[in-house]
Amino acid sequence: MLNYALLMVLHLIGDFYLQSDKVARCKNARVGEKCNSCTECKKGSYLNVKYVLIHSLIYVIPFLLLVLITDVKTLALVILILAVSHAIVDAIACWANKKTKVTVVFLIDQAIHSVVLYLIFRYAGLNGIPDAYAAAVKVAFVVLLLMAPCSILVNKLMEDTFPESVSLGLFDVGSIIGILERVLVVVFAYLGELAAIAIIITVKTWARTADLQDKEFRNRYLLGTLASLVSAVLVFMLYKLI
């Protein structure tokens, strides 16, 4: 499973950390104040093909590292499969975002990408990763997953539940607090200090006592906190499976 974890690490880098806000917005044809209003993004458009293709090409860049554990011919085939499948899945996701809940689309989108990577793991004949790198791959997988992907998932859940809410960027204060919260939850879960997790939630809640008097804020706070906690627990469970 270590090779699969490596594929997931490369996927996370390509899909979340090499994708700029502009590409993410433009591939979904979201015309706004920060948009130059490309001719492809007319009113009612579902996607911008140019940016879907740009993202798909950038996405496969991290996978070039697989040359260390496979031959060039196999690598070329893997890169081609990943680029084409990613473009197709993302194009469908862009269309679906206009039709249904973005949280559902996001989860299905990532599930499909994960299945494609698993098939590559099973049938591409990749060489094994030396045990010396096992810990680094596992830690990278957990850290990368706890940051951007979990933050985006929470943001999309908030967007679906509270349509008027403003999405937070990865490095906004709220997102940073959420990231630190998830990291601490995973660390304490790894150490078996479950009581410390309760303390984190207690301190966080105490710090927002005044704001919690507002019903709307209270609902947002509870949903965001619970979603963040659940995602952290799921990441820890995935770590244990690697």
Task: Walk through the language-model features, giving the residues of each.
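Juxtamembrane boundary at the C-terminal end of a transmembrane helix
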Residues: V233-I242
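Alpha-helical transmembrane segments and their membrane-interface junctions
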Residues: V187-K204
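Short hydrophobic alpha-helical segments that form membrane-spanning helices or hydrophobic packing faces
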Residues: K22-V23, P62, I120, I199-V203
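Alpha-helical transmembrane segments
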Residues: M1-V9, T74-I81, A134-M147
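Short, aromatic-rich membrane-interface segments at the entry and exit
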Residues: V72-I79, D131, A195-I199
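Interhelical loop and helix-boundary elements at the membrane-water interface
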Residues: F16-S56, V89-F188, A207-S231
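Transmembrane helix-loop-helix
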Residues: F63-S85
